[in-house]
């Protein structure tokens, strides 16, 4: 009889628990709504490549709570934004950006974020420019390594994400100085390789070149090939602007 009573008590407890569950879930959802913002009637590009659709998005703080493809009851939300006539998408990635120049002095990056850009890739064209406040003026001759870049911006909270290349031209300046209007020696190429590899170990996305600018225009094919081979498993990016007779 005792065993039966235990089963009976357990069964009754389960019944009460499941009866109470919808109420608790409902209360939790209401709490979420009270702390959330709902954007309604907006064209949504979800980043998957699928066709856009009209729907609503609920978010709280920095988190997207739910994406709705159907009409949503808007009562109870902390804030409601009518997105009629507007489009909503994940942040854009600017894969060739110069927004980093001056961003230490204007960390809100208004020119980028007002275009929907949330991530930039810097140190393109083979140059890793030093920020203006680090030198008297932005200098392409002053190589700004990835380690220096990370250290410099560690105490400067900026409004966008920044990825970076290792920059061939700036590295060539570092190694060869003003004597860059010639083919590099084997020793100089090895020094460049070490700097590129150090950048990669610090988180560089790949190697960028600008072979139509000083000093890269004076580099040999061997120099470029050896540097790219040193980081063969990463990305190599070259900026081509004008047609030339030079081999690519």
Predicted regions located by residue number:
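Bacterial N-terminal signal peptides that target proteins for export
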Residues: 2-12
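Bacterial N-terminal signal peptides
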Residues: 11-20
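Bacterial Sec-dependent signal peptides at the C-terminal "C-region" and cleavage site
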Residues: 19-32
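Histidine-rich, glycine-flanked metal-binding segment
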Residues: 29-35, 44, 48-91
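Divalent-metal coordination cores built from histidine and acidic residues
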Residues: 86-87, 92-93, 97, 105-207, ...
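Divalent metal-binding pocket/active-site signature
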Residues: 201-240
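Single conserved hydrophobic/aromatic residue that forms the stacking wall/gate
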Residues: 239, 244-248
């Amino acid at each position: 009889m005792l065993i039966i009573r235990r089963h009976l008590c357990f069964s009754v407890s389960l019944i009460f628990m499941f009866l109470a569950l919808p109420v608790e879930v409902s209360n939790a959802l209401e709490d979420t709504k009270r702390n959330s913002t709902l954007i309604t009637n907006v064209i949504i590009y979800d980043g998957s490549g699928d066709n856009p659709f009209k729907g609503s998005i609920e978010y709280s703080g920095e988190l997207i709570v739910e994406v709705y493809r159907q009409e949503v009851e808007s009562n109870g939300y902390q804030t409601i934004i009518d997105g009629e006539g507007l489009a909503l998408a994940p942040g854009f990635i600017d894969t060739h950006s110069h927004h980093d120049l001056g961003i230490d002095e204007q960390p809100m990056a208004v020119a980028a974020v007002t275009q929907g850009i949330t991530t930039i890739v810097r140190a393109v064209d083979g140059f890793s420019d030093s920020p203006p406040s680090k030198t008297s003026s932005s200098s392409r001759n002053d190589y700004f390594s990835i380690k220096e870049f990370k250290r410099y911006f560690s105490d400067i909270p900026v409004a966008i994400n920044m990825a970076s290349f290792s920059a061939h031209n700036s590295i060539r300046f570092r190694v060869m100085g003003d004597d860059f209007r010639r083919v590099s020696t084997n020793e100089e190429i090895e020094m460049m390789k070490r700097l590129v590899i150090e950048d990669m170990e610090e988180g560089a996305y790949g190697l960028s070149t600008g072979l139509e600018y000083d000093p890269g225009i004076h580099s040999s094919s061997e120099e470029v090939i050896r540097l790219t081979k040193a980081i063969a498993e990463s990305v190599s990016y070259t900026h081509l602007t004008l047609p030339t007779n030079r081999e690519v």
